[in-house]
Amino acid sequence: MNHQTLLAIYQRIEALIAKLPGPLQNAVMKELNPIKQIFLSQRLARIVLLGDPGADVSALFSALLGSDLRMVDPQQDANWITYELKGKGGFRVLDARRLNETSLTWSALAGAIVDQSPDLFLFIAGGAKQIDLALACEQGSRLVEMAEQRHQAKVGLIGVIDLPASMSSSEVENRRLELQAWLHGSPKLSGHLVKSVAVCSFVRFRVDGSIDLERDERRNIDVLADTIARELPEEAQVEAARIFRAKKTQSDIAQKLVRSVTTVCAAVGVQPIPLADFPILTALQFAMVTGVMQISGRELGLKAAAEFFGALGLNIGAGMVFREGARAAVKLIPGWGNAISGGVAAAGTYAVGRSAMAYFIEGVSMAEARKLFNRRKLPKSSKLGSS
C-alpha cells in the first residue's frame, strides 16, 4: 500500500475543506475521518494456524492468492512470518500446529502471541481420510485461551477442511460436519467458532506463475476469502480483501467509501459559493476513485486514476461539470435553487464511484462502466444529496 500517496491526497482534500464555512467543515470532516482511518491505518492481518500438521497450508494460501506460494515450515522457533506480493499487500502467519512434531515450545508460542495479538485463528484439516483431531483441538484451545487472556479480545476462529475435487458433495458435507463437531466439542474453540468451510485448494501453476485453467479445481475458495476478510478488524480488512481477492468484502468497503464521499459532495454542492467548491468536489472524486483502486488490489497510481476519468469522458475537473449541470437545471426550474446543485453533485459523484467499482472490482469492460456512469442515478433507497 502506498501510504504516502494516499496521505498526500487526503492532505490536499483537508487543505481545500479548510476554505469552507466552519459548520460545513465540521460536517464534512466528520464524514471523511472514518474513511481516512480505514485507509491510512491499514496493516497486515495476523493469522494463527491451528489444526492438522499434515494439512498443506502452502496449497491453501496459494489457492487464496491465485499465486504459487511456498510457506516457511517452522522448525526451531515460533515466529510471525510475513508474506507479501508486490503491489498486492500481504499478511502475517504464526504456524502453531506442530508442537508435537518439532522443537516448538509453549513458551516460544506464548512469546509470539504476547508480542502481537492475533486477528484470526484458522483451524485447518485436510485429506480424504478421517483423522483424529483431539490433540490439535486441545492445543488449539490452550492457544486461543492464552491470546484471549493476554489481549482481552475474543478473536474469531474459522474451521477449514481441504478436500479433493473428486469427492462427492455429500462426502464433502459429511467431512465438514465432522470438523465442525470436533470444534464444537471443545468449549473454548466452540465459543470462538465463526463457521466451518469445506474447500478444494488444488490448482496447477505454470512455470511462469500463471494458472493452468484446465487444472484449476478450486472450490469455495472465494467463500473462505470473504469469511477471512470479514472477520478481521477494520484496520486489517482492506489489505486482506486485496491480497485474498475477497470480492464481496471489497464491494462492501468500496460502497461505504462511495456513499460517504457522495454524501460529502452533496453537502458541498449545495453551498452558495460560486465555483469555489469545484476543486473540492474534484479532489473528493479523485480520492474516491484511487480508494476503489486500492481496495480492488490494483497498484495505486494517480496516473491510472486520471486515465479512468478520461475513459469516462471526463477531465480532472469533473466536479465542475456536475456543478454546471445543476446551474442549468436551476434556470429551467426557478425556486429550486441550490438543492438541485447538491443533488446533481451527489448523482455525478455516485456515478463515478459506482463505475469505478464495476470496472476495478467487478471486472466489467470500460464500455459497460461508461454506461453506468451515464445513467447518473442514486440508489432508490438513498437520501444522498437531499440536504
Question: Which residues make up each language-model segment?
Answer:
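Conserved G1/Walker A P-loop phosphate-binding module
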Residues: M1-R97, T290, E299, R354, ...
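C-terminal-of-GTPase-core extension/linker across diverse P-loop GTPases
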Residues: A18-I38, R46-L49, R204-A267
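Conserved C-terminal guanine-recognition region of P-loop GTPase G domains, centered on the G4
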Residues: L85-K88, S107-V194
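Short acidic, Gly/Ser-rich segments with clustered Asp/Glu that frequently serve as metal-coordination loops
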Residues: A96-L104
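Canonical P-loop GTPase G-domain recognition
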Residues: V155-G156, P164-V238
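Hydrophobic alpha-helical transmembrane segments of membrane transport and translocation systems
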Residues: G353-S387
